Amino acid sequence: MKTPLITREGYETLKQELNYLWREERPEVTKKVTWAASLGDRSENADYQYNKKRLREIDRRVRYLTKCMENLKIVDYSPQQEGKVFFGAWVEIENDDGDRLKFRIVGYDEIFGRKDYISIDSPMARALLKKEVGDLAVVNTPVGEANWYVNAIEYVK
């Protein structure tokens, strides 16, 4: 189950996508559908079929974003978070082999297209929550447990 949390930046990104789809792309595609429909036979009209399909995709995404944004809770930075890993933190970790990772713990709807973001619901994020610099986080993986040490914690203020 995904936790309905999002950073302010993530919420603004979703809002911009919704605005773009609803105010710019959808009206443009609607015009193309109308134009293609006016050409006659729709069964063999590739422009009509493609744009009709695109319109359905846009409408599906708009419905998803609208419903999703109603249920999301924006989590802003709080000074009480300083020094510990919480939602929205940039965390640098290192394992026993010296491998280092740096990522931000964010909501499910923010991770797509970003390799440096992980979901708050991931095993790694759950293991890191409330840890401080120097703490050991034991992460359950499909092949057993992995040990990671917290090297740094930063917040976007």
From Swiss-Prot:
Protein's UniProt keywords contain DNA-binding: yes
Classification via InterPro entries: GreA/GreB_C_sf, TF_GreA/GreB_CS, Tscrpt_elong_fac_GreA/B, Tscrpt_elong_fac_GreA/B_C, Tscrpt_elong_fac_GreA/B_fam, Tscrpt_elong_fac_GreA/B_N, Tscrpt_elong_fac_GreA/B_N_sf, Tscrpt_elong_fac_GreB
Keyword tRNA-binding belongs to the record: no
Record keywords: DNA-binding, Transcription, Transcription regulation
PROSITE patterns from the UniProt entry: GREAB_1 (PS00829), GREAB_2 (PS00830)
Pfam families (alphabetical): GreA_GreB (PF01272), GreA_GreB_N (PF03449)
SUPFAM superfamilies xref list: FKBP-like, GreA transcript cleavage protein, N-terminal domain
Gene3D superfamilies hit by this protein: Transcription elongation factor, GreA/GreB, C-terminal domain, Transcription elongation factor, GreA/GreB, N-terminal domain
Biological process terms in GO annotation: DNA-templated transcription elongation; regulation of DNA-templated transcription elongation
GO terms of molecular function: DNA binding; RNA polymerase binding
NCBIfam families: greB (TIGR01461), PRK01885.1 (NF002506)
Family that this chain belongs to: Belongs to the GreA/GreB family. GreB subfamily.
Role: Necessary for efficient RNA polymerase transcription elongation past template-encoded arresting sites. The arresting sites in DNA have the property of trapping a certain fraction of elongating RNA polymerases that pass through, resulting in locked ternary complexes. Cleavage of the nascent transcript by cleavage factors such as GreA or GreB allows the resumption of elongation from the new 3'terminus. GreB releases sequences of up to 9 nucleotides in length.
Protein name: Transcription elongation factor GreB
Organism in which the protein naturally occurs: Salmonella typhimurium (strain LT2 / SGSC1412 / ATCC 700720)
